[in-house]
Structures are given as C-alpha cells and as structure tokens.
C-alpha cells in the first residue's frame, strides 16, 4: 500500500503543504510507526541535514512551531 494511504488510513487527512516522512529514510518501510507528517519546509531541512531519529525530528518541529508562532 502507498505510504500516503497508510498514513491517511491511520491519521486522517494530510494537512495542506505538509509531507509524509519516512523516519528511517527507507521508502519501502511503510509501517505507520515509521511515518510522520511534517510541514514541507521541515521535511526539506530533514533531508538536507540528515536528521535520523524521531527525537531530533521532534526538536526540529518544536523549533519550527515556536518560530511560526512568534512571526
């Protein structure tokens, strides 16, 4: 099953301008525990910087959300 369909089946609609990220970077691993929705800009940063685990991704999301709220 397509990873986006897997995500939507479990979590509902993907927000506009958000992407689904494979946490382990393995696009064949479509287990729901390996999928996370992210704003597109955060997704780009993850792939450019090589953030590899959920903890680092969560820190990045918190920083993004904090910056969005203050701007």
Question: Where in the sequence are the language-model features?
Answer:
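Intrinsically disordered, low-complexity terminal/linker regions enriched in Pro/Ser/Gly
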Residues: 62-71
């Amino acid at each position: 099953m397509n990873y986006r369909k897997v995500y939507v089946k479990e979590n509902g609609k993907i927000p506009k301008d958000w992407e689904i990220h494979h946490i382990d970077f393995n696009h064949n691993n479509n287990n729901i525990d390996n999928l996370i929705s992210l704003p597109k800009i955060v997704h780009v940063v993850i792939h450019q910087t090589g953030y590899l685990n959920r903890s680092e991704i969560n820190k990045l999301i918190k920083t993004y959300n904090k910056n969005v709220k203050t701007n």
